[in-house]
Amino acid sequence: MEPIWAVGLMTGTVLDGNIDVALIKTDGERIDDFGTYRLMPYPQSIRSLLEETLTAARAWNFVGPEPAIFRKAEEALTRAQSAAVKELVEGYGMTMADIGVVGFHGQTVLHRAPQVGRLGQTRQLGDGELMHSLLSTKVAYDFRSADMRAGGQGAPLAAAYHTALMRSAGASGEVAVLNLGGVANITWWDGADNVVAFDTGPANAPLNDFIKSKGLGDMDRDGALGRAGTVDEARLAKLLQHPYLTKPYPKSLDRFDFGAAMADGLNAEDGAALLTAFTAGAVGKALDLLPTRPKKLVVSGGGRHNPTMMAMLASRAGVEVVQAESLGWSGDAVEAECFAFLAVRVLRGMPISFPSTTGAPQPMRGGKLAG
């Protein structure tokens, strides 16, 4: 199959007010060209709307009709992300006619993992048909629902792309990819046919929520608060006894499954230190679950910009930690690139999730296609 140009979109559960947009050329198996990437801010009005929507989603919790705010938020974010796609493509000297497909993940507002006797449920806001009409380009969307209807976790979906990246870099077995978004997820590949992926625990979401609750901004910028704080080791040890952390994979999390309340009663510095250490400790427990424990973690996502997080990963997870850029990847772009890659797989009828990554009963094609 000939590679085609595809655009990927991602807005994470951390709600940082930005749209990640990436352009790659791929056949859905290999990456032919890393085109370009941009981080484009939402207008404040949409950011506020999404925060209200997340609150409404948690109150709804898949019971009864969807909150009315979903429709309003869905249209607003679809229009904003469509504009971001056009701006990226035209800024790269191309037109939408050059783009084979857009991968539109949408905004996750609620994700409930399956339990024994109960299928999981997930809701991403994003109107693929509207985006198709705005861009006149095929749009792949709703990537997670089919996997969950079949009994899978619906997450993480990055495994196919992470594996393609590792294959291109000749990295396997002793190397794993860790993405630090709102939630942290890991992908391990044995270099042959075995790929394992799962959510390890929280990453930026509880830390950012805690910082916001203290009125100190949106995040622990440069890890300054966490670095200045002291970790309550007894409290951390108790938190690390959470059964999720030793539960066998496949497994997935909602961004609110581990919350800022873990640091209740602590000052800003000590709370940031505790939450950062918890993320690192949870990753360490995840590494112990893998078929072989990797010696190196290649880290992507926003959390890698936090030097305290990176240092704690090395010391508390007992692993060498390197930036995605050390392998020639763009660590900020990986998630958006992933959905461009998956969109091509949807377009070509290829699976996007697997029994060893989401627990689906067989490789799942997934995704819907508009256009």
Swiss-Prot record:
Name the pathway.
Amino-sugar metabolism; 1,6-anhydro-N-acetylmuramate degradation; Cell wall biogenesis; peptidoglycan recycling
InterPro entries xrefs: Anhydro_N_Ac-Mur_kinase, ATPase_NBD
Task: Name the EC number(s).
Answer: 2.7.1.170
Q: Name one GO biological process term.
A: peptidoglycan turnover
Q: What does this protein do?
A: Catalyzes the specific phosphorylation of 1,6-anhydro-N-acetylmuramic acid (anhMurNAc) with the simultaneous cleavage of the 1,6-anhydro ring, generating MurNAc-6-P. Is required for the utilization of anhMurNAc either imported from the medium or derived from its own cell wall murein, and thus plays a role in cell wall recycling.
- Catalyses which reaction(s): 1,6-anhydro-N-acetyl-beta-muramate + ATP + H2O = N-acetyl-D-muramate 6-phosphate + ADP + H(+)
Keyword Transferase annotated? yes
Please name every pair of cysteines joined by a disulfide bond in this record.
none
UniProt-annotated binding residues for ATP: G12, T13, V14, L15, D16, G17, N18, I19, D20
Q: What is this protein called?
A: Anhydro-N-acetylmuramic acid kinase
The species this protein belongs to is: Mesorhizobium japonicum (strain LMG 29417 / CECT 9101 / MAFF 303099) (Mesorhizobium loti (strain MAFF 303099))
**Gene3D superfamilies, alphabetically?**
3.30.420.40
Any one GO MF annotation of this record: phosphotransferase activity, alcohol group as acceptor
Coiled-coil residues: none
Q: Which UniProt keywords apply?
A: ATP-binding, Carbohydrate metabolism, Kinase, Nucleotide-binding, Transferase
By sequence similarity, the record places it as follows: Belongs to the anhydro-N-acetylmuramic acid kinase family.
Enzymatic class: transferase
